[in-house]
Design a protein with these regions (language model features):
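Active-site His/acidic residue clusters
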Residues: 114-119, 197-209, 224-225, 229-263
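Phosphate/oxyanion-binding active-site loops and adjacent basic polyanion-contact surfaces
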Residues: 125, 212-221, 258-262
Length: 263
């Protein structure tokens, strides 16, 4: 059987039908209609339904959900890339890497946050951000993009800046699109972060609207496609992570704008 050359997995973090329906209602209202406007994702020819409970709770969190999507294994809330007993589980990204695919991980939130982390890291706690970041090296994935890093210098602020650590070990870390286009060309492994988070912690569960100089999700995805190229097959996980953050803050317009950006 012929295998797909390009595989994209899009994840709307914390997104359910209610978020989609609210966004479509907003679009219909703008057109002066009572319903009828549909997002691109709502027009796909096939739908599937899945249970979302984790191994220890009816309500999952992003690390347990991300692990389930990445590996097919349900786990406990707060666990990342491990089973309920703490044994590492294998992400589909590693399976595809072994099958000759280049790998890209793209998100609107920190690259060491729960959903992206589930595709390359294993940790008993999703909040061990610095250690999760260090596991980027083990992955050897070719492209990462996100807002930046949580715990930039470790939990206590006493570790080496994580971008310097990663650069010392073979990754090019670029902040913003201009820096990416200038520095990433010809590099094997690249991490694209937002210009607004250079040399500092990325924001966490903050949904205050896009920062003007920051790249959009579509722009980061385009950079990933460009970097991975067409010589080898590739897999990209692309997450609209701040959809969830708008939900945490009970802020409907950030939810709507982030769903639209994701769509």
């Amino acid at each position: 059987d012929q295998k797909a050359k390009y595989i994209f997995l899009f994840i709307g973090d914390g997104m359910g039908y209610n978020h989609v329906a609210a966004t479509e209602s907003y679009l219909s209202y703008k057109e002066g209609k009572l319903g009828g406007e549909m997002l691109t994702m709502s027009q796909f020819p096939y739908y599937g339904v899945a249970t979302t409970f984790s191994a220890n709770d009816y309500v999952t969190d992003s690390s347990a959900a991300g692990t389930a999507i990445a590996s097919g294994e349900k786990t406990n809330n707060y666990a990342l890339g491990v089973d309920p007993e703490g044994k590492p589980v294998k992400s589909m990204a590693y399976d595809l890497q072994e099958d000759g695919y280049n790998i890209g991980i793209v998100t609107t939130v920190a690259v060491n946050h729960a959903t992206p982390g589930a595709f390359y890291a294993s940790s008993a706690s999703r909040e061990d951000y610095y250690d999760i970041s260090k596991q980027i090296l083990k992955s050897e994935f070719e492209f990462f993009a996100g807002s930046g890093f949580l715990d930039f210098k470790g939990k206590k602020g006493e570790e080496a800046p994580i971008d310097a650590y990663l650069e010392d070990n073979g990754y090019e870390v670029s902040y913003g699109l201009k820096e990416f286009k200038k520095e990433a060309a010809g590099k094997d492994r690249v991490i694209l972060c937002q210009e607004s988070n250079k040399a500092e912690n990325a924001g966490n569960y903050i949904s205050s609207g896009a920062i003007a100089e920051d790249a959009t999700l579509a722009e980061m995805l385009s950079c990933g496609i460009e970097h991975l190229g067409d010589k080898k097959p590739f897999f990209i996980m692309c997450e609209g992570g701040d959809i969830d953050w708008g939900g945490h803050g009970n802020k409907i317009m950030p939810v709507v704008t982030n769903v639209l950006s994701f769509d």
